[in-house]
Curated annotation (Swiss-Prot):
Gene Ontology MF terms in the entry: rRNA (cytosine-N4-)-methyltransferase activity
Entry protein name: Ribosomal RNA small subunit methyltransferase H
Gene: rsmH
Enzyme class, first EC level, given as a word: transferase
Family annotation (Gene3D superfamilies): Putative methyltransferase TM0872, insert domain, Vaccinia Virus protein VP39
InterPro entries recorded: RsmH, SAM-dep_MeTrfase_MraW_recog, SAM-dependent_MTases_sf
Residues that, per the record, bind S-adenosyl-L-methionine: A32, G33, H34, D52, F79, D100, Q107
Keywords: Cytoplasm, Methyltransferase, rRNA processing, S-adenosyl-L-methionine, Transferase
Function field: Specifically methylates the N4 position of cytidine in position 1402 (C1402) of 16S rRNA.
Catalytic activity from the UniProt record: cytidine(1402) in 16S rRNA + S-adenosyl-L-methionine = N(4)-methylcytidine(1402) in 16S rRNA + S-adenosyl-L-homocysteine + H(+)
Enzyme Commission numbers on file: 2.1.1.199
Pfam family of the protein (one): Methyltransf_5
Family: Belongs to the methyltransferase superfamily. RsmH family.
Species whose genome carries this gene: Bacillus pumilus (strain SAFR-032)
Length: 310
């Protein structure tokens, strides 16, 4: 069963200023929590388009959202093709977009998907099960230098070199097949005192491999720009991030597009095309309330940023 606790539900959807006859895109359908609440505010003239590359998520969403009076369109695709897929449906502009960048709980909790360091399972981590690159391939075939780079860049792991060295030693003897084997190797690469602090010792490396396997940061950057381009004037975008790398991309994109470029002093009017594209609705990110954290610990690292197209 696809159970998924939605994070910052009302804040995310209410932040879009929903119009009942508007067109909205949920780029990360997942458990369909945000979509379900959004649909409750749409009339039969409204439209929701839900993107997901996970078959289980799409099947669950179809079931959960059946019977809504609004129009619903499900698209099985990575959101990096957001504009292209919408254009194929004859949609060239929208009134609101949601990104919820957390790995959905069912993906984390299904051991055979290989996302979790809590279960022993085959190394996989592909959001799209038909993709060629898996965690097993990264761990067993990528050169030492590339492993160090992704552990440091995507996992902000201090012991990147030591861990990559241990992986290199282990895979010379036999291929690393499971998450459990990888966890043990990671622990060997981290000094004992450091293993006792800062959460699970494999957390950062698993995050790094997942980001690399799914090309998450580049995909998000591309999709975010496409989403902003698709927005109608006064249309809004809500983005929930779960780690500093994604939040940095969102923050800098929003800041860049909501501020004026450096202009010569004393210009009487701002030249056309140079006006900011966005207005920030949230100066600082919205975080989960104490009340939400009581029943959903995964919301602890969530940050929500909202912007409006000018």
């Amino acid at each position: 069963m696809f159970q998924h606790e939605t994070v910052l539900l009302k804040e995310t959807v209410d932040g879009l200023n929903v119009k009942e006859d508007g067109t909205y895109v949920d780029c990360t359908l997942g458990g369909a929590g945000h979509s379900s609440y959004l649909l409750s505010q749409l009339s039969e003239k409204g439209t929701l388009i839900g993107f997901d590359q996970d078959d289980a998520a799409l099947d669950h969403a179809r079931e959960k959202l059946a019977g809504s009076k609004a129009n619903i369109l499900f698209i099985k695709s990575n959101f990096r093709y957001l504009k292209e897929r919408l254009n194929e449906q004859g949609i060239t502009s929208v009134d609101g977009v949601i990104f919820d960048l957390g790995v959905s709980s069912p993906q984390l909790d299904t051991p055979e998907r290989g996302f979790s360091y809590h279960h022993d399972a085959p190394l996989d981590m592909r959001m799209d099960q038909s993709a060629a690159l898996s965690a097993k391939k990264v761990v067993n075939e990528w050169p030492f230098e590339d492993l160090v780079r992704i552990f440091y860049k995507y996992g902000e792991e201090k012991f990147s070199k030591q861990i990559a060295r241990k992986i290199e030693e282990a895979r010379k003897k036999a291929p690393i097949e499971t998450t459990g084997e990888l966890v043990d190797i990671i622990k060997e690469g981290i000094p004992a005192p450091a293993r006792r602090t800062g959460g699970h010792p494999a957390k950062r490396v698993f995050q790094a491999i997942r980001i690399a396997v799914n090309d998450e940061l580049k995909v998000f950057e591309e999709a975010l720009e496409q989403a902003i381009e698709l927005l109608n004037p006064k249309g809004r975008i809500s983005v929930i991030t779960f780690h500093s790398l994604e939040d940095r991309i969102c923050k800098s994109t929003f800041r860049e597009m909501s501020s004026l470029p450096e202009l010569p002093h004393g210009l009487p009017v701002i030249p056309e095309g140079l006006e900011p594209k966005l207005k920030l609705i949230t100066r600082k990110p919205i975080v989960a309330s104490e009340q939400e954290l009581e029943h959903n610990n995964r919301a602890r690292s969530a940050k929500l940023r909202i912007a409006e197209k000018k």
